A protein has these predicted regions:
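Short S/T/G/P-rich N-terminal loop/turn motif that feeds into the first structured element of a domain
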Residues: 1-110, 118, 122, 152-155
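Short amphipathic alpha-helices in soluble, non-transmembrane regions
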Residues: 126-131
């Protein structure tokens, strides 16, 4: 399904609302724009990642006193996410440390990851999966800031 109608988008937004919108998550307008874009795959999501020095798990989480770094916490999420991406026909295209910004404004990015999905439906199927959602606690604990650019490969 390349194009989502308003009712389908509203249902999905209600489903995902429990995790929150904005900050390190897309806001409702961004997610609605993606779903209603009519774009279909393959699509590459370019993830710019900046980590907390120390992971910020909720107090009641078993890993709260663990002393994990933000990057280590995000790595736990990354393992879960990659499994879900691959199961849906996607792939990890690139995963690199950022060394410096050579041109442009300095940004706080620590790493870049590019995930390729066969289409928007594969991405939506993943983010609806309860097992994937259970891994979001590690993403939330590790990420200080992020930007995700949705792109279409030209080559």
């Amino acid at each position: 399904m390349a194009l989502w109608n308003d009712e389908e988008v509203d249902v999905l937004l209600r489903e995902l609302g429990s995790h929150g919108f904005g900050g390190i998550n897309p806001d409702q307008g961004q997610l609605r724009s993606l779903l209603e874009s009519g774009e279909d795959g393959p699509l590459q999501f370019v993830n710019l990642l900046s980590y907390h020095a120390d992971a910020r798990y909720p107090e009641e989480h078993e890993l709260a006193p663990s002393g994990l770094s933000g990057a280590e916490a995000y790595g736990r999420y990354g393992a879960v996410a990659l499994d879900h991406v691959v199961r849906r026909g996607g792939t990890l295209v690139l995963y690199n440390d950022v060394l410096q910004v050579l041109i442009g404004q300095t940004a706080p990015w620590d790493q870049i990851a590019i995930m390729q999905y066969p289409g928007i439906d594969a991405f939506v199927n993943m983010i609806r999966d309860p097992d994937y959602q259970a891994g979001l606690v590690h993403r939330d604990a590790g990420l200080a800031e992020t930007a995700i650019l949705v792109s279409r490969p030209l080559l």
